[in-house]
Amino acid sequence: MFTYVGLIKLTSEGREHLEKAPEYLEKVKGIVELEGGILEKTYAVMGPYDFLAIVKYPDTETAFRVLAKIAKLEVLHTETFPAEEVDVFLKALV
């Protein structure tokens, strides 16, 4: 499984119905799990984003498929980045 970090912003529609944020996040979790991914952690954050998610997918194709399905919800925008532990990065330097 490969790790991805997702930075999530609610859309104007998502902010308009902020009380439904738990429902939106459950839908996202359901989509991730249905496609074989694992939503490891979700954090509420301060700043330009509303949430940060740590997600594992079996491959990049699955990540793309999940992100396309999430985009269809039209209540949040995501920016997603592949991530690796620092030790792996440091080993790649030598």
Which residues make up each language-model segment?
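A generic structural signal for short beta-strands and their flanking turns/coil linkers
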Residues: 4, 35, 47-49, 74-76
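Short S/T/G/P-rich N-terminal loop/turn motif that feeds into the first structured element of a domain
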Residues: 1-33, 90-94
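Flexible, active-site-adjacent loop/turn segments at secondary-structure boundaries
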Residues: 8, 16, 44, 79, ...
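A short linear hydrophobic-aromatic micro-motif
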Residues: 36-43, 77-79
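A short acidic, often aromatic-flanked loop/helix-cap motif at beta-alpha or helix-coil junctions
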Residues: 48, 86-89
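An amphipathic, aromatic/His-enriched active-site/gating alpha helix that lines ligand/cofactor pockets
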Residues: 57-87
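Short, well-ordered beta-strand segments in beta-rich or mixed alpha/beta enzyme
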Residues: 5-9, 43-62, 66
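A generic hydrophobic-segment detector
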Residues: 1, 38, 55-57
